[in-house]
Amino acid sequence: MCIRDSLDLAWRLCRGVVSNAILLVRDGMLVGLGSGQVSRVDACRGAVEKARQFQGASGATGAVAASDAFFPFADGPQVLLDAGVTAIVQPGGSMRDAEVLADVDAAGAAMLVTGTRHFRH
């Protein structure tokens, strides 16, 4: 499965998950899920932890991530990048979108901005 298909799958799955939602997909399979957290960075940590719990120490390596709402700061994506995520899809809309995108780009990863939120309570 190519990165584009993985991002599409992660984005579609993200619609049905309780906010704040972060999903990790690798090889056509959901490998990590962080949801229902108060902060987006905690949801990122939860998704990475679940990936490691069920896939081993390198659980998130090579995965892509989806977020149901924008990243207000670069700390959430940094958690994902540090775990080995290669691409992130998110709706955008933060005042700091340019900063977050620049940080992801500088790390050598890709970020796709959809313009559509899945965030809900």
Task: List each language-model region with its residue ranges.
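Short, small/polar residue-rich loop motifs at catalytic or cofactor-binding pockets
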Residues: 16-19
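Glycine- and Gly-Pro-enriched alpha-helical subdomains that act as flexible
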Residues: 23, 29-77
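Conserved small/polar residues in nucleotide/adenosyl-binding loops
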Residues: 1-6
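General beta-strand structural signal in soluble alpha/beta enzymes
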Residues: 21-25, 32-33, 67, 89-90, ...
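Glycine-rich, charged/polar anion/phosphate-binding loops
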Residues: 7-11
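C-terminal binding/interaction regions
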Residues: 73, 78-121
